Amino acid sequence: MQRDGTNEQCFLELASPMSFILNILRNMLAYFGVPVDQDLLIFQNKDYGSARSIVRVIGRMLPLEPCRRPRFELTPPANAKEVDDYELAVPSFADVLCVADDGEAGCLRFRHSLWKKAEGKAALFHPSKLPWDLSSPALSQNRTVADDLPVSEAAIKKIAALEDELTSLRAQIAAIVAMQDLGGGGETGFISLSDGPSMEQVPPSSATARLSVEPDHVPSVVLSPPPLPPPPPPLPPPQFSLQPPSSLPVPPGSANTRGIDNLAAEMKKRPSGVKKTDGSHHSESQRVSDVPNMLDVLKDMNKVKLRPVERSPGGRPIQKRRRQSSQWDPVSLISNALKQKFAFQDDSFDSENRSWQGSPFSSPETSRNGSRF
């Protein structure tokens, strides 16, 4: 009986502090808003979730604001490229040499983050190292100074050469148009080497284009307005001759000698300035005579006919059979000779795997199924 009394006394002594601790825990949970009827399985803690410890449970019940998380943004440089130019790759030992050689960089960079050499070296962007603001008046003043730089002499020469070529092309186009108009009107004329500044002998009433010679001997084009009535149908162009017309037949040798003598006499009579202009007009007239007439080129366009091609019912063109080559054809002779030369050789696929005579040094033949023990 004494033993039973001592056991009950020990149990009460142990139970009183446990109940006291439980009361404290219940009061704390009630203070933080945890219902008393909720069973807290303290001894069955989970390895995941917010019920792993009492601290997490209390933190979930309390209306606490989460602390602010820092966010980092990478500002690209002024001449930044698109994101596609950068490659995502795992750094390797090859990046060590890249970092060691890059002495200008202020931070660590891998070789995959660098730009191409053709685009230029990659420049890091440091906002604290900007010498001035982008909207400052000093930057705008530098831009205006850079825009006001004088043009180089090479560019001026190129522009002048292009202008000269343009004027020459305009002169050629005007000459072609004038020749076509003369051929359409049915008026004949000829180009003479002994004329003055005019290049063609055309009455002023029927001329539709006028060529004027400038001091630098480049003809400029001044086109007159087109006539109101419709033009007549085109006629064959006149034949321009460098010789004066004559009714009597003249042998070619005598005509050439007479023309040369007349030109030499006229050149002696005229002053030196006129001789230069005549030479320029002679080159211009020769250039105009060398230009083909577009009417002659395009007059037979309506007569062009396509060759009929035989087609199958499906629409595919039928290929003609090749003619059998004769025995004396060089291609057939060479092919027959080659066939006769290599006819004794066996070109079968199994000839490489066969040996004519068994060699003592050759490897023994093995069966396909392998050796069986």
Curated annotation (Swiss-Prot):
UniProt protein name:
Mitochondrial fission regulator 2
Protein keywords: Coiled coil, Mitochondrion, Phosphoprotein
Function comment: May play a role in mitochondrial aerobic respiration essentially in the testis. Can also promote mitochondrial fission.
Pfam families assigned: Mito_fiss_reg
Where are the annotated coiled coils located?
Answer: 151-179
Q: Which GO terms describe its cellular component?
A: mitochondrion
What is stated as this protein's family in its record?
Belongs to the MTFR1 family.
Residues that the record marks as modified (Phosphoserine) are: 136, 312, 348
Q: List localization entries.
A: Mitochondrion
Q: Where is the composition biased (Basic and acidic residues)?
A: 275-287, 297-310
Stretches with biased composition (Pro residues) = 224-239
Q: Where is this region: Disordered?
A: 189-331, 346-373
Source organism superkingdom: Eukaryota
Composition bias (Polar residues) maps to: 354-373
Q: Which GO BP terms sit in this record?
A: aerobic respiration; mitochondrial fission; mitochondrion organization
Q: Which InterPro entries match?
A: Mtfr1 (IPR007972)
